[in-house]
Amino acid sequence: MIKFDLTNRVAIVTGGAQGFGLAITERFIEAGAKVVIWDIDEDAAKKALDKVNSENLSYQIVDVSNFEIINKNLIEVESKHGKIDIFINNAGIAGMNTTVAEYPIEEWNKVINLNLNSVFYC
């Protein structure tokens, strides 16, 4: 495996409490980064903290489909850690498994807000 050094780098990983996001979080911690998980699932975030068990890992409960919440939390991360060096925009959802004709508009808006708008917001 290629080794890389992220000592004293600050990273935010959206959706960082599970799946690919957690794998990225773990690798960044191993490389020396300070990582802040942004996730909407507090239980999963707490489990990630317990699993990784590093003083360089913290989390914030952030709905990345909400521009105001993103800005508030960015300010908090910057005030605690300084400059943000790495931002991994990993949060996303698959939505429902149904036809377009049967797809509820509320669900469509939720998927678009999280998978598309949040990328622009972040």
Locate each region found by the language model.
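Conserved NAD(P)H cofactor-binding loop of Rossmann-fold oxidoreductase domains
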Residues: 91-96
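Conserved catalytic-site loops of classical short-chain dehydrogenases/reductases
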Residues: 85-86, 109
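Substrate-binding pocket helix/loop in short-chain dehydrogenase/reductase
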Residues: 98-100, 107-109
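The beta1-alpha1 cofactor-binding region of Rossmann-like NAD(H)/NADP(H)-dependent oxidoreductases
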Residues: 42-43, 61-74, 105
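Conserved glycine-rich Rossmann-like NAD(P)H-binding loop of the short-chain dehydrogenase/reductase
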Residues: 33-47
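Canonical Rossmann dinucleotide-binding motif of NAD(H)/NADP(H)-dependent dehydrogenases/reductases
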Residues: 4-35
